[in-house]
Curated annotation (Swiss-Prot):
This is Peptide deformylase. Its cofactor is Fe(2+). It comes from Chlorobium luteolum (strain DSM 273 / BCRC 81028 / 2530). The lineage of its organism: Bacteria, Pseudomonadati, Chlorobiota, Chlorobiia, Chlorobiales. PANTHER family: PEPTIDE DEFORMYLASE (PTHR10458:SF22). The gene is def. It is an enzyme of class 3 (hydrolase). It comes from the Bacteria. The active site is at 137.
Length: 190
């Protein structure tokens, strides 16, 4: 099922998400819907708060990108960044901030502890685009958007676009949730 994407001003995007205690049929169904919604929106990563569910779950699929064709889609539950290395400034965008891009400085490598779709624990090192996408999506789980990490002067330049998104004036090629306050209580989050 394709789920609507929450945008910039929706409250659920500014809250710290709650950890999952396991994966049941409802969470498994949510994971499938998140992959379907991400693909429908031509995204490479999607965090549960973006679909109105305040839980520590994200999905990503970077296989559409050159050099990442062999990377399988990932389900990441309860992620914890254990270490970071290096720095890299790169332009980012986000399904929750349609039509806006901006430069964000992030660590270029991370060590991540997380659980997969089967709730099995992993500790792995990630670099390059995969590290960036993971950090971007983990930010969503902590109530942070990429625009919150932009330089102040760059953020001021896009403020009108952010105001337009908040006012519902910016269209997207995928379903957008308006005035969504499910915050983890909607049917997709059960």
């Amino acid at each position: 099922m394709i789920l609507p994407i929450n945008t910039y001003s929706d409250e659920v995007l500014h809250q710290k998400a709650k950890p999952l205690k396991g994966v049941d049929a409802d969470i498994s169904s949510l994971i499938d819907s998140m992959f379907e919604s991400m693909e429908n929106a031509s995204g490479i990563g999607l965090a549960a708060p973006q679909v109105g569910c305040s839980i520590r779950l994200l999905v990503l699929d970077v296989s559409c990108m050159k050099s990442y064709e062999d990377v399988p889609p990932m389900v990441v539950i309860n992620p914890n960044v254990l270490a970071v290395r290096g720095k890299n400034l790169m332009e980012e965008g986000c399904l929750s901030v349609p039509g806006v891009q901006g430069d964000v400085l992030r660590p270029s490598e991370i060590t991540l502890k997380y659980r997969d779709r089967n709730f099995q624990e992993h500790t792995e090192e990630f670099s390059g685009m995969l590290a960036r996408v993971l950090q971007h999506e983990i930010d969503h789980l902590n109530g942070t958007l990429f625009v919150d990490r932009m330089e102040k002067r760059d953020r001021r330049r896009i403020q009108q676009e952010l105001d337009d998104i908040a006012a519902g004036l910016v269209p997207a090629d995928y379903p957008i949730a308006r005035e969504c306050s499910r915050g983890g209580e909607g049917p997709a989050c059960m």
